[in-house]
């Protein structure tokens, strides 16, 4: 995926695998956890969360990221391990999340 972060969306893409691994470890993510990820961007954190066995509900506003993430995580989406929502997390009604448990 070759697109740069949109500062208007407040984007900052994660790149350092060590940082992402440390984040997942610090959050004590274990298999069976359900994680809400705001702005998965390029899917770096998403990938680590899925590898840890978590189910991920990823809410992405950027139109450019949706096709990329849909293709990158096609198998996880088909298996129900990843739910990719095209929405603005700041306007998303958290009550709608209950349908994904």
Segments (PLM) and residue ranges:
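Catalytic cores of RNA-modifying enzymes
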Residues: 1-101
């Amino acid at each position: 995926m070759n697109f740069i972060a949109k500062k208007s969306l407040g984007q900052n893409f994660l790149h350092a695998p060590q940082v992402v691994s440390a984040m997942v470890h610090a959050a004590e993510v274990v298999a069976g956890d359900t994680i809400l990820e705001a702005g998965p961007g390029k899917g770096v954190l998403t990938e680590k969360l899925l590898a840890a066995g978590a189910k991920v509900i990823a809410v992405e506003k950027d139109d450019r990221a949706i096709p990329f993430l849909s293709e990158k995580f096609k198998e996880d989406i088909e298996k129900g391990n990843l739910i990719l929502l095209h929405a603005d997390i700041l306007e998303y009604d958290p009550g709608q999340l209950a349908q994904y448990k």
